[in-house]
Structure formats: C-alpha cells, structure tokens
Amino acid sequence: MGRELQKAKNKSSIPKKRQKGPSKKKILQNPIIAKHWNQKETLSQNYRRLGLTSRLNHATGGQEKTIALLGLNDPKSSRADIAAGSTANALNIVSKAPQTIDVEELEVERDPETGAILRVIGQKEETANPLNDPLNELDDDEADEWDGFAMVPEHGEQEQVNPVIRELEEAAKNGERKAPRKQSQREEEWLERLVARYGDDYGRMARDRKLNPMQQTEADIKKRVKKWQASQASQA
C-alpha cells in the first residue's frame, strides 16, 4: 500500500532533447537519378551504387570499406587471395614472381686454377655490383618490378558501364541547352539611364552612387551594357 500523500512531481525546466531521425534526401532536380534513388540507403550508398560521387577530392576518412571496394572478389585484383577479414597494411606492395624462368646462355670467364667465375663476356648492360658478386649479372629484375599498392583494385579494360551513367550521358548529349538569362525590364531601364548620361565611360558609371547604388564594378557594368546593346541591335 502506497503513501497517502504522494509528492507532486515538479516539472523540469529543462526541455527534453529529442534526437532527429536520419534525413532523407529528396532528389527533385534530375529525373534519372530520382528514378533509381533508394530512400532506404544513405546518400553515400546511393551514389556508390549509381556510380556517382558527391565530391571530386580524395576521401580523407570515414569511408565505408566494402568487399567490392577492396577488390577481394575480383579475380583480377591483386588482393583476390586475401581473406575479407584481413587487416593488411594499406601500403603493402605486391610484386608478381615470374611463373616461368627464361633459359639463357652466357659466356663466362673462369679462373683456370679454382674454376670460379671471374666475369661474364658479352654482357651489353653492366649492372651495379658493389659486392663484386660474379653471378650478379644473372639476376632477373622482373621479380623486383613494382606492381602498385595492394589495396587498389585492378579493373579490366572491358569493364561494364553503369546503366545510370549511360542514361545520364545520353541525356546530356541529347538534352536541351539551358536558355541564356534575359535582362529584366528594370535592368534595361537602369542601363539606358547610365548610357544616356555617361555614354561609354564605364568608370564614371561605377563611381556614380545614385545611379549605381548596388556598387556594381566597372567590368560588370560594361558586360551588362554590351549585352543590352546586342539585344537592342537584334530587335531593331
């Protein structure tokens, strides 16, 4: 049994903070992107699936690591044989060992007493040999060739183009061009007053505080006047 006199709960003056839900980006500008947009995915996930990017600069962190991004399932990738949970260093250098060894005949000069190789005869290019190793010329430099970073996936030449990218390219190629901006009637009247008073002296137009209250620069006024004069000539 509870107490007879319950203490009234004082209302706190601190407002409750409610966490906002994830914002859903509505794509209203481009109908092709809006048609393939998935509201259940984030902006980065949608852009990655559509083959787009929200920024042209290199990612500096916070990028979601996926198997497809690391190229683990790509047989042509240098990391195809590494497990998905591997924590290999991103700067590991992968070198391809030669599968077959080319047989080559060389003429060598031996010591008549010990039979040791003194030098290789007929070698076109002399390689560095600081330790005076007589077999230094037989080393194959192909095994030491740098093949890039391990984390960078390699793509083939016949990579399939994303259908969304193909639609966007066709729309950009065959789409209507944006009409140039037309000057309003008030802008034309303002330019007409400037030209009537100063002619082609754009420096005095820019310094006039009454006729140029928005402090447009000399170059901007000149560009507007040239455009206004061209429109007047076409209408005549």
Swiss-Prot record:
Biased composition, class Basic residues, residue ranges: 8-27
Alphabetically ordered keywords of this record: Nucleus, Ribonucleoprotein, Ribosome biogenesis, rRNA processing
Any one Gene Ontology BP term: rRNA processing
Entry-linked Pfam families: Nop16 (PF09420)
Location in the cell: Nucleus, Nucleolus
Gene Ontology cellular component terms for the protein in this record: nucleolus; ribonucleoprotein complex
Region Disordered, residue ranges: 1-28, 206-236
Assembly notes: Component of the pre-66S ribosomal particle.
Family from the record: Belongs to the NOP16 family.
Task performed by this protein: Involved in the biogenesis of the 60S ribosomal subunit.
Name the UniProt record assigns to this protein: Nucleolar protein 16
Classification lineage: Eukaryota, Fungi, Dikarya, Ascomycota, Pezizomycotina
Designated gene of the protein: NOP16
